[in-house]
């Protein structure tokens, strides 16, 4: 019989009060918390994955796609497009003719959200992908 099996056999003989005292002493001795995680979630150790479960990496770069611009808001959207990019007036106007089109590519989530907010306030329909 291994040491672990012997310990398990001894644990089986403990009363509920003795078990509670054992848990308290283990917590104090090793500086751990034996209480269940909040919400009852089970945490897996880093690197452990369930069989058949795919690892999904969080996306770090985003594209801002202008899908449509209301005709009465075109001028205000042009101003925002010029502010967000280095496009001149003619290039910005040409950009708005053939939509949907990516305005900014490979940018951070925060930058994409800010660009989307500015464009939508100006009157554009925008997606972040």
UniProtKB/Swiss-Prot annotation:
Homodimer. Part of the ribosomal stalk of the 50S ribosomal subunit. Forms a multimeric L10(L12)X complex, where L10 forms an elongated spine to which 2 to 4 L12 dimers bind in a sequential fashion. Binds GTP-bound translation factors. Its main location: plastid. Keywords: Chloroplast, Plastid, Ribonucleoprotein, Ribosomal protein. Belongs to the bacterial ribosomal protein bL12 family. It is found in: Plastid, Chloroplast. Forms part of the ribosomal stalk which helps the ribosome interact with GTP-bound translation factors. Is thus essential for accurate translation. HAMAP family: Ribosomal_bL12 (MF_00368). It comes from Tupiella akineta (Green alga). SUPFAM superfamilies: ClpS-like (SSF54736), Ribosomal protein L7/12, oligomerisation (N-terminal) domain (SSF48300). GO terms for molecular function: mRNA binding; structural constituent of ribosome. GO terms for biological process: translation. It comes from the Eukaryota. This is Large ribosomal subunit protein bL12c. PANTHER family: 39S RIBOSOMAL PROTEIN L12, LARGE RIBOSOMAL SUBUNIT PROTEIN BL12M. One of its GO terms (cellular component) is ribonucleoprotein complex. Gene3D superfamilies: 3.30.1390.10, Single helix bin. Pfam families: Ribosomal_L12, Ribosomal_L12_N.
